[in-house]
Amino acid sequence: MSKLSHSEVLNTIRNGLIASCQPVDDGPMDKPEIVAAMAQASLIGGAAGLRIEGVDNLKATRPTVKAPIIAIVKRDLPDSPVRITPFLQDIDDLAAAGADIIAVDGTDRVRPVTIEAALKRIHELGCLAMADCSTLAEGLYCQQLGFDIVGSTMSGYTGGEVPNEPDYQLVKDLKAAGCFVMAEGRYNSPQLAKTAIEIGADCVTVGSALTRLEHIVGWFADEIKTAKV
């Protein structure tokens, strides 16, 4: 955990960019020391905070940065579609490794641990709690429970075709309801991230467009293939 108070953490990330340093799974950059380097480079570039996946990656990154860290663990479970920090042990491990904010799946889906129990554990361990939601109803429920941050993270990722554009309406609606809003999900250009802040997001998380080199190179390579010469 950084030496910032909860209010200082929120003030630090307010109106700022959160760099999600999550390499492609099992790719050449999926190593804790590389994640830590990505995190440091992101802060040099102007990020206000970081989102780090995995306890080992968090352990490698925390000693190298003072900025707020949102931490998660991703798992693929046989009996639940929930992937983001599904177990209380994950929360315990992230808190011990230095997370300032712990994010959990906030969707209304079958899960091994209730949202209420996850929130209680996060706060007991002295961390701020973030809910990764997909709908306004989910976000409002998590706000009422006492989550400190509500994200649009899961919008478009709970079934069906994934949209191309971010869910601006969800960001607007969450803000209108009084949430501290993290815009997240498909904000893959500077203009889209800027728009998120302009429509009311308190901060915006960008991942693939910053730290997944395979994706970024692919965007360029695919576009070049369509060039008419």
Swiss-Prot record:
GO biological process: carbohydrate metabolic process; N-acetylmannosamine catabolic process; N-acetylneuraminate catabolic process
UniProt superkingdom: Bacteria
Reactions catalysed, as given in the entry: an N-acyl-D-glucosamine 6-phosphate = an N-acyl-D-mannosamine 6-phosphate
Gene Ontology molecular function: N-acylglucosamine-6-phosphate 2-epimerase activity
EC number: 5.1.3.9
InterPro entries: Aldolase_TIM, NanE, RibuloseP-bd_barrel
The protein's enzyme class: isomerase
Gene Ontology CC terms: cytosol
Keywords: Carbohydrate metabolism, Isomerase
Pathway: Amino-sugar metabolism; N-acetylneuraminate degradation; D-fructose 6-phosphate from N-acetylneuraminate: step 3/5
Alphabetical list of PANTHER family matching this protein: N-ACETYLMANNOSAMINE-6-PHOSPHATE 2-EPIMERASE-RELATED
Assigned protein family: Belongs to the NanE family.
Reported function: Converts N-acetylmannosamine-6-phosphate (ManNAc-6-P) to N-acetylglucosamine-6-phosphate (GlcNAc-6-P).
HAMAP family assigned: ManNAc6P_epimer
Name of the protein described by the UniProt record: Putative N-acetylmannosamine-6-phosphate 2-epimerase
